[in-house]
Amino acid sequence: MRTLCGTILVAAGAAVAAAAPLAEYPGEVGEKTGWKCVGSEEGKVVYIPFEGYYESKGGRIESPRFKLDGEIGKNRFYRLTFSAKCPVDGYWWVDFFDAEGNQLPDVNSRLYASDDWTPYDVMVPAQPDAAFAQIAFVTKKGAQAKDVTMRRASVAEAAKWCNDLAATLPKLDAPETADAWAKLPKTRGKVLSGKRVNVVFLGDSIMNDTWCGNAVALIQSALPQADLRCFISVRGSTGCWYYHEKEHFDEYVAKYSPDLVLIGGISNRDKEQAVQEAEESMVETIERCKAIGAEVVVCTPPPSYEFRKDSSALPFDRALMKDGSQTFHLEQGYIRRAAARTGAALWDLTTAPCEAISRSGKPLDWFKRDAAHNDDRGKQLIAQTLAAYFGNGCSGLVR
């Protein structure tokens, strides 16, 4: 943990220009510095926006809400630095809000249990309509934080942060991306010509994690002439079984006037839903996208819940991806059939990161922040895989 949050990331921060901080709290934060403590009932199942129904993650201490800088309407990145200590694992957390105060999908990752002050240097992506933010620390046993600062970062800075982190992780085999854009001619044409492209990441909290790995920074760095506006649009534990209905589609997709929709996550089949029903609801969602002029990428499920029996370094068992396997969250036969039926592009976010995790021999929780969700390590494996499809597939602009 110290290598991840201390040496590697602090070293990456050494080259960063000292932008004026948007939020800065020297010393230990608390009620005297304007922060608020919010309690919780331990063990109670609660609805967490953009994540779903889970046992309460614990109480939180949260900053006052503050205004973001940068141009509204474009993706931005922010470097968050702090030191923290907590008796049990918890979460650092950033909530976002639009100009009217409506909550947008959050960014959060793991606080590692430690009796000593541990430095963190993390990168936080904000979507185009984000206008305000709030920082929080969440644990079941109480967390302490000090020297909290959040400042704007450039695309290059954010991409470097990603690549520095990736260099500390198990080797990730590049996915096959030669024909990644073959079914996306309109989007590719706009990317190559520098025209604005609205991209919607649609799914569940796992799709939110795909976003939170700062994949957009890697994509924008690989395609510097492109004018990409990337939006994350998610609902906890939700997939096409919900989004295929017109009122939900309009709320989560159509309002962004997308040129490209990425459908992903692990919730595109409700556990009570037959495989054929899941396939049909995905087909209908894709057809709705096409009807409003958007092209579609269907992403296979990235790693989430543990799929290994133990931490032995073994090859990834691809049988786990079959419909009806014991790893419900990785099944994708119906996903591949829906893409084939509709002519949507299919990008594999399963194989490369799952193979890297399988071969690593790392402990079962080394890539995760809780049972379902990845920490910055797991997120980065997914982000690098997704960025490879964008960059390598649209070779006309790759540096």
Report each predicted region and the residues it spans.
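Bacterial N-terminal signal peptides
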Residues: 6-15
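A short helix->loop->beta-strand "cap" motif at the edges of active sites that frequently abuts
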Residues: 291-295, 344
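Catalytic His-Asp segment of secreted/periplasmic serine-dependent ester chemistry enzymes
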Residues: 303-399
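Positively charged n-region of N-terminal signal peptides that target proteins for export
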Residues: 1-5
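Residue-level recognition of beta-strand->loop/alpha-helix junctions
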Residues: 232-236, 300-301, 348-351
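Extracellular and organelle-lumenal recognition/adhesion modules and their flexible linkers in secreted
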Residues: 18-178, 182
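Alpha/beta-hydrolase-fold catalytic nucleophile elbow
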Residues: 264, 299-300
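Conserved SGNH/GDSL esterase-like catalytic core that processes O-acyl groups on lipids
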Residues: 171-283, 307
